[in-house]
Design a protein with these regions (language model features):
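Aromatic "clamp/platform" in nucleotide-sugar-dependent glycosyltransferases that forms part
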Residues: 318
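Nucleotide-activated donor-binding/catalytic signature segment of Leloir-type glycosyltransferases, i.e.
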Residues: 263, 267-305
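Short hydrophobic beta-strand element within catalytic cores of glycosyltransferases
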Residues: 326, 335-338, 348, 356
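Conserved acidic donor-binding segment of nucleotide-sugar-dependent glycosyltransferases
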Residues: 350-361, 369-374
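A short, well-ordered alpha-helix in the C-terminal region of glycosyltransferases
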Residues: 369, 376-390, 397, 403
């Protein structure tokens, strides 16, 4: 069963002071031409990841601009989401023995949802979990878009060979960057649209510094000492073990340093519990290492507080679609040390926002520099905030999606 996610309209007016005038004008013009257009955003979960956060804000803005926008999530049991998590990892390059039984399970759930989709002008399908639904709907009149948020540049051949025919039945595909496109994908149209953050969401809105610090202190963290922070799902690709190893190297040079790993348990990610249990052992052994989840009261507002209190944010990703936590930290004026992978270099360059790294040793070296040179760290972070303001705030993403929808519908009616 498809689940409709309740979304409150978000007036565009409060975003206008952040926009260059031409961007605001283009959004207004596109929205006027799309008034009443029925747009469905379809993904696997309503909480726990960057896609869900994006859709909550994006759909709200589209509604306020007059589009008949909806957000729905697919249902499925634990067996289905175990299959889709394996598929997700395989598309990012992990070797995967994708069995016939798993393929059948995946297709059965997708087929069951197809009958519920009717009456839309545009359907935007996010990531691999619902990617086969298009196959079972018949041609219809709707325009279908597959929106891929992960790095599929070197997928496992078996998994991608299975999924590719279903992806290619869509009218267009959207990737974060051109480098993510699998080499053998053939589509009528491809677009490249990076994600963005909502500066007025509970995770990113401005907060008084004393409120942020007191909130973090309530979780037992010493806010008078340096704090390293990684905000990421508990996923091997986010390398929480590498983050801990980095922290341990930094602690040799800066004994007062602490590390907080903050992540959420998403409904479509059963593997997260395995990763969480593996790192929770280290948490118990080190009083300066903290592991928090949404299940112990660390929601979006608390993440905001942690990011504003952190001295340095770490994003020790091995593979990354975009890494929204990088832009979130830079928006708050906090320097970032992050893996040079996926969409992270779009947001961050050495000396502009922070530093890109490929090893634990490099990460530790850069963090020690930032801890020992707070004035330089503040200047580096300020430069990163300017990049985010120009390129990675929600109105730019809204404009890009409205452009795509307008162009696709114009072509369909030609």
């Amino acid at each position: 069963m498809l689940n409709r996610v309740p979304v409150q309209p978000k007036p565009i007016d409060r975003y206008l002071p952040l926009l260059e005038e031409p961007l605001g004008q283009e959004i207004s013009r596109l929205a006027a031409s799309l008034r009443g257009t029925r747009v469905l955003q379809l993904n696997a979960t309503s909480y726990g990841g960057g896609v869900a956060e994006l859709l909550l804000s994006l759909v709200g803005l589209e509604q306020s601009l007059g589009l008949a926008a909806e957000w729905r999530t697919i249902g499925g049991d634990e067996a289905f989401f175990s299959v889709t998590k394996q598929l997700h990892n395989a598309l990012q390059g992990r070797p995967s023995p994708f069995t016939e039984e798993q393929k059948t399970r995946y297709l059965t759930v997708n087929r069951q949802h197809a009958a519920e989709l009717d009456g839309y002008d545009v359907v935007i399908v996010h990531d691999p979990q619902p990617a086969a639904i298009r196959h079972y709907t018949g041609r219809g009149h709707a325009t279908w878009v597959w929106r891929c948020h992960i790095d599929t540049s070197a997928p496992d051949e078996t998994a991608w060979g299975f999924l590719r025919p279903y992806v290619e039945e869509h009218d267009a595909a959207v990737f974060t960057m051109a480098q993510f496109v699998p080499p053998d994908l053939t589509m009528p149209r491809m677009e490249f649209i990076p994600p963005a953050i909502d500066p007025f969401s509970s995770k990113n809105r401005e907060l008084p510094g004393d409120l942020a610090r007191s909130t973090v202190a309530e979780f037992g963290v010493d806010v008078e000492r340096p704090l390293l922070l990684q905000v990421a799902r508990f996923d091997p690709w986010k390398d929480p073990k590498g983050a801990i190893d980095t922290y341990q190297l930094v602690k040799r040079e800066v004994p007062a340093v602490q590390l907080a790993l903050v992540g959420s348990m998403a409904g479509d990610d059963p593997e997260a519990w395995e990763v969480f249990r593996a790192i929770a052992h280290d948490d118990r052994a080190d009083r300066d290492l903290y592991v928090f989840t949404n299940l112990v009261g660390v929601g979006s507002l608390e993440v905001n507080c942690f990011q504003r209190t952190a001295t340095v944010v770490l994003q020790k990703s091995l593979r990354e679609g975009f890494g929204l936590a990088v832009s979130e930290a830079l928006w708050k004026g906090v320097p970032v040390v992050a893996g040079a992978t996926g969409g992270i270099p779009l947001q961050l360059q050495d000396g502009v926002g922070g530093f890109l790294i490929t090893t634990v040793e490099q990460a530790a070296q850069r963090i020690v520099f930032l801890l020992r040179h707070p004035q330089e760290a503040a200047q580096i972070a300020a430069a990163g905030r300017r990049v985010v303001t120009e390129h990675f705030l929600l109105p730019r993403l809204l404009r890009d999606e409205l452009r795509l929808i307008h162009s696709l519908l114009e072509g369909a009616h030609a």
